[in-house]
Design a protein with these regions (language model features):
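Non-catalytic protein-protein interaction segments used by genome-maintenance enzymes to assemble
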Residues: 150-203
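Hydrophobic/aromatic-lined pockets within catalytic cores
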Residues: 28, 55-60, 184-187, 214, ...
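Short histidine-centered catalytic/ligand-binding loop motif
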Residues: 39-40, 107-108, 191-200, 239
Length: 280
């Protein structure tokens, strides 16, 4: 297993020969064909990336993200012309925005002041969460690894190599003990997170990470944090039944991907139920 402490996002995601958790989840939800499809970053993905980076590496956040703060220019416009109903449509505002955009470097991503404030509130909510605090207290660790990248050296019996990049690891003697995964959401209640859990196949994510890092699945914790007021946070893990089912399904998906790697074809890359009759 190769371990990288400072591998960039771009370099990590370029290693497409190694199967990732995202790939596994996409196969489970649809097919290998869908898992291979490239998607442009959405505003939600950009916000999630900014949030994770802020939580884990402030220096990287400052390098990669720049905040568009129009508070002062809006206040100035309204002070001079209080009759203006939409300051962003004025010449002064457009000039200010154009000058700002010219100052942004090619490798930087712009987020709004509102998004920046939301991330700060989310961070405080997570830090203050006593459930999360208890994890740090209950599990003996001597280090914390944020966004370390792990890549296997040799293919397994399915002929596959794997990669994982956990948000946060609690580590003891260089060995991962606990996996913590930040989840931005609109609703951190049990009902809402349970729906997200199955919709986005977080169970398979935990199985994949824990299997590769040899961490017990009941030591994988999701910290769900609302990205809107009141910015509640809650901590979740997996019960024994969910753990076992996720591990079994993970092995079936690995087998499916392995067969496709060995024999790429529409039959091996398409829907699992494409060439049979399915009774509902």
């Amino acid at each position: 297993m190769k371990i990288y402490s400072d591998l960039s996002n771009a370099d990590y995601h370029s290693m497409s020969d190694h199967v990732s958790s995202s790939f596994v989840k996409a196969v489970a939800k649809h097919s290998i064909q869908r898992a291979m499809k490239k998607f442009d970053p959405t505003p939600a993905l950009i916000f999630g990336d900014a949030m994770h980076t802020y939580f884990e590496d402030r220096l990287a956040f400052v390098r990669r993200f720049v905040v568009f703060d129009d508070t002062e220019i809006v206040a100035k416009i309204l002070e001079q012309r209080p009759e203006i109903s939409v300051p962003s449509m004025t010449r002064e505002y457009k000039t200010f925005k154009a000058e700002f955009e010219q100052s942004v470097k090619d490798d930087q991503t712009v987020i709004t002041q509102y998004e920046m404030q939301s991330i700060e509130y989310m961070y405080k909510s997570a830090v203050d969460n006593t459930g999360l605090q208890s994890i740090y207290q209950d599990f003996d660790h001597d280090d914390i690894w944020d966004e370390y990248s792990f890549l296997t050296n040799e293919p397994d019996f399915h002929g596959l190599n794997y990669r994982v990049r956990p948000d946060r690891l609690l580590v003891k003697d260089e060995q991962p003990v606990v996996i913590i995964d930040w989840k931005s959401c609109r609703d951190a209640s049990e009902r809402a997170f349970r729906a997200d859990f199955w919709k986005f196949r977080y169970d398979l994510q935990a199985a994949f990470y824990c299997n590769l890092l040899e961490v017990p699945m009941d030591q994988f914790f999701y910290v769900a944090i609302e990205k809107e007021f009141p910015y509640n946070s809650a901590v979740f893990s997996l019960n024994e039944d969910t753990q076992m089912k996720a591990m079994r399904e993970l092995e079936l998906i690995k087998e499916r991907i392995g067969k496709w790697k060995e024999n790429p074809s529409p039959e091996t890359s398409g829907l699992a139920n494409a060439n049979t009759i399915t009774y509902l």
